[in-house]
Amino acid sequence: YWGKRRGVYSNVMGFLGGINWAILVARICQLYPNASPSMLISRFFRVYSQWKWPNPVTLCHIEEGPLGLPVWDPRRNFRDRGHQMPIITPAYPCMNSSYNVSTSTRYVMIQEFTRGYEICQAIDENRATWDDLFEPYPFFELYKNYLEVGITARNEDDLRNWKGWVESRLRTLVLKFERYTHEMLLAHPHPRDFSDGSRPRHSFYFMGLWRK
């Protein structure tokens, strides 16, 4: 719920999905097995706001299995070395479940973890409430520049298919921004599309742009 409210719940956009969040929460439960629910929430934000990425989050030791299947290993695999925010699945073969994360989306998520921890501290001091933690992310108030990607189709079925195709490639666009500007320009993709009731069979995606 928190991830959706704060705009960081979308694996296809380069954020995290259900499996990723479940592993992150499970790791906190391992670290603090006797903690109360409110303490677990506070520790969640504290740990991940201070986590030394790209050190991986794991629930168990990564082991080579008897079948010889490849497992996540940045020492051997060049592609694994480039992963920004490794969250490793516990079952064999252990793989990075968050390979879609980019420099831009990692930055956004760390900012959100930091905000969450600061609010949890304020809650402990009676300076904030849990409602503050779940405030919607003010996406259209934070950036000076936005990129709009518009989609038009002849009918609703074509629009649905076209939207899926475009959505799956927006992450690649973010990576190209980073690569061709040497990470001087970063992009924050909004995790969902928008529509305009006055323009049927149209849909829009937005990215907030900022310079480092």
What does each model-identified segment do?
Residues 1-212:
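Non-catalytic helical "accessory" subdomain of NTase-fold nucleotidyltransferases
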